[in-house]
Design a protein with these regions (language model features):
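Canonical Rossmann dinucleotide-binding motif of NAD(H)/NADP(H)-dependent dehydrogenases/reductases
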Residues: 1-28
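Conserved NAD(P)H cofactor-binding loop of Rossmann-fold oxidoreductase domains
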Residues: 86-92, 244
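Catalytic loop of short-chain dehydrogenase/reductase
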Residues: 129-179, 191, 245
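Conserved Rossmann-fold SDR core element
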Residues: 168, 178-192, 234-241
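C-terminal substrate-recognition "lid" of short-chain dehydrogenase/reductases
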Residues: 217-241, 246-247
Length: 258
């Protein structure tokens, strides 16, 4: 079993890379600029007895997108069987402030790159095998890291949200188009790790303001990944791991607050 995790050097990408290694996967750890962090993750994976390789690529550059999957297959010694499209640009804009540059950056990293990697992944993967019932078992799994925002739209982070909406559509259409050889699913994290530009106070408030009055932990995200790995009959699904954030209903009109 071989996996490629984009944005695998830090945060949830790191957690998923280590989780996959703990389950016996050899892992290619993609990074854009965090080489030291990627090398550290590779060291941890190798300590678990699995192959690992750090692979640099700028996912805003088409040629580097196109080369990443072949590089992962070569580094790990065979076809990649699990692709985690995790790398993402998350920068603020709205309908009034968005520029061509902010639009392109979000679309390239959050939608175009996963599309290109999905194409390459499907092309190098063996066809589905059959089980004891003579029914096909997909040989590949793609997980697209989306966002609970696609379930609860707001006008904030406009380019990012629109790109993630596109990634959700890509998840569903590729689940259709690549079946039965590849399963494609998505995870929508809510407040899990404090953001680089976020104060601790705001992060704690964000977690508390979910339906469950708690956010997710990295282990909740890897548990969702494990569910998809272990569920050969599941494809085209989005699992929001967000404390119910996408179900938030206590708005001022409901609470009687003017």
């Amino acid at each position: 079993m071989r996996a490629l995790v984009t944005g695998g050097a830090k945060r949830l990408g790191r957690e998923m890379a280590l989780y996959l290694a703990a389950r016996g996967y050899d892992v290619a750890v993609h990074y854009a600029s965090s080489q030291a962090a990627a090398d550290a993750v590779v060291g941890e994976i190798r300590a678990l007895g699995c192959k690992a390789q750090a692979l640099p690529a700028d996912l805003l550059i088409e040629a580097e997108m196109q080369g990443l999957l072949p590089a992962a297959s070569q580094a790990l010694g065979g076809p990649v069987t699990c692709l985690i499209n995790n790398a993402s640009i998350f920068e603020y804009d709205n309908v009034e402030t968005a520029t061509r540059n902010s639009w392109d950056r979000h679309m390239e990293s959050n939608l175009r790159a996963p599309f290109v990697l999905t194409q390459g992944f499907a092309a190098q993967l063996p066809k589905a095998q059959t089980d004891v019932n003579n029914e096909p078992i997909a040989q590949g799994l793609i997980i697209n890291m989306i966002d609970q925002r696609v379930r609860k739209l707001t006008p904030e982070f406009a380019s990012y949200t629109i790109a993630k909406m596109g990634l959700w559509a890509l998840t569903q259409t590729t689940a259709q188009g690549l079946a039965p050889h590849v399963r494609v699913n998505a995870i929508g994290p809510g407040p899990t790790l404090q953001g680089a530009r976020q104060s601790l106070e705001h992060f704690q408030k964000q977690r508390k303001n979910t339906v469950l009055t708690r956010g997710a932990n990295p282990s909740d995200i890897t548990a969702a990944l494990g569910y998809f790995i272990d569920s050969p009959a599941v494809t085209g699904q989005l699992l929001c791991v967000d404390g119910g954030q996408h179900l938030a209903w206590q708005t001022p009109d409901i609470l009687g607050i003017e």
